[in-house]
Amino acid sequence: MATNDLFPPEPPLPDPAHVAQLRRALHEHAHHYYVEDAPTIPDAEYDRMFQELQAIEAQHPELITPDSPTQRVGGRALEQFASVRHAVPMLSIRTETDTEASGARNFDTRVRRELGLDEAAPAVAYVAEPKFDGLAMNLRYESGILVQAATRGDGEVGEDVTQNVRTIGQIPLRLPADAPSILEVRGEVYMRRDDFEKLNEQQRARGQKTFVNPRNAAAGAVRQLDPAIAAQRPLSFFAYGLGEVTPEQAGGPAFGTHYELLQALKTWGFPVSALVGLAQGATELVAYYESIARQRDALPFDIDGVVYKVNSLALQRRMGFVTREPRWAVAHKFPAQEQFTTVLDIDVQVGRTGKLTPVAKLAPVFVGGVTVTNATLHNEDEARRKDVRVGDTVIVRRAGDVIPEVVSVLLDKRQPGATEFTMPRQCPVCGSAAVREEGEVDYRCTGGLFCSAQRKQAILHFAQRRAVEVEGLGEKLVDQLVDGHVIRILPDLYRLGLTALASLDRMADKSAQNILQALEKSKQTTLPRFLFGLGIRHVGEATAKELARHFGSLDAVMDASLEQLLQVNDIGPIVAQSLRTFFDQPHNREVVEQLRACGVTWQEGPPAPVTPTPLSGKTFVITGTLPSMSRDEAKDLIEAAGGKVAGSVSKKTTFVVAGTEAGSKLTKAQELGVAVLDEAGLKELLDGHS
């Protein structure tokens, strides 16, 4: 026999770069999920990536690093709230990878193996409960009084959200006299589906942003910095476990099973789900799983699976923990719900900032408890990657039970002649050119002043304080003006009359007169403010000032060639092309001319001579409160002397101008060795260059 047959080569090590990339991706997605409450991928995909990393590290323990996502529980605490170190870590529960009912049998088999039970041994007793889709919470009571509520955070350190949690009616603020002197109750803060729908109706009525799902709404309420706002959000709570508790030898409770613990929670005044059940062995676990799956869509709250726990606390202690999770519990998720449907059309929608998004219009299909008729294709690259075409039969998944997506196309069912989707090169709303800039994935409409899809955003941007400044013209008033068809295009602002304004909801004559006076006042502006107010992509305040200084007049800016634009200080190819594209659209030029005809005016002068300014090439950052001038005034002085004002400190920063309560920007400047000036130092610098 050959040597190679006797000693087969070991399988190759995984690519370290792939392992590192997997960790980075998991960290990033965990941050979006736990900290920002804005998940970027479906739960199922995160679980798949996590399980891949777990498998690699199990095969190759030498690749485990202290910062691996497998070595900790979840996200990290937000900085806005005080940090709380948990007396007993809030560990997460392992997810069963088999999302069929057989996954319950897998868990029972694993438990029996861990406990060394043979086939003749009695069935293991379990507690089974729904896996609530909310926010994990730790409630700490001392001498029967709620003294602290904290989120899971990273399992070791969470966020102190006591004031907000006190507003939840289901959570007792005082416990009965027989409750332990130290008691930490763990459970889930969630929002009922009917409460979620009512909340979104209220948000729509106020013209405010609606919430994506009950979990995000609940998490957002708990993390509100203003408890008064949190109190207006209808939150609920289910208790399912304990943290730190007065020990038995010090007079604390003595439980033999997890189920007894849950019954005690009820007697102390905590809500425990009526769906919690006892199960003997694998067969009853499977029956419980199937029963909850059937009830899922009819439940008044969202769940995404069930949780099984060994009932005996003695057996729990015997089984113990592994790394980040208990061996005696598992989360058994439901399968991602998928259905077949047909693509009826592919529409391109235009967002309020001009972004074009392809959307598959679907034959109605019931997925994940809702009827789905649309699925985003995100952008041209994604649409091409999936190659979705009109008439295709596709698999649609309500991924993570939240976001409908087209998973794949059944190519064998594709009809002959189905044409490939291409993004339009004109805006489907206004007909202006749609442009995809180098390095970007999105197409954007260039008719920002004319496009009805961008109308509200264009008006708000034009009227803001840093542009022409129309005092009192806020989002709610703009909503009324646009939705009521009072304003079609930007110049219509200056055609408003008292009668039209006074007829709006909650608009008295005096308020209407104030708006008209503010509009009249805004007509006297400056060229930099006007240019900034046009909302040209990539043209901020500093760029607008450079354009005005360089060309002197609006007509010169509008007619400048790419080559001429590139001669302006701090303007590169992307900004130059953005300017040229904007002013090449006849719609945009027409709006500009109408604004001038309505009386919007400014002083113009000759182009600035090409001479170096005193602070040319120097970058400033202003932080804190200055004694005798506002930050805007300091910014104007610096820019008038040719300096540039940035929003963040970097190695390229020349000076940081620091007032009182300067904060992190001053700290970073000191770390980087950037020169720091106070107001007197800034004045001295400006005087020295005047």
Curated annotation (Swiss-Prot):
Binding-site residues, Zn(2+): C427, C430, C445, C451
PROSITE patterns, per database record: BRCT, DNA_LIGASE_N1, DNA_LIGASE_N2
Swiss-Prot/TrEMBL cofactor(s): Mg(2+); Mn(2+)
SMART domains documented for this protein: BRCT, HhH1, LIGANc
E.C. number: 6.5.1.2
Uppermost EC category: ligase
Protein name, UniProt field: DNA ligase
UniProt gene name: ligA
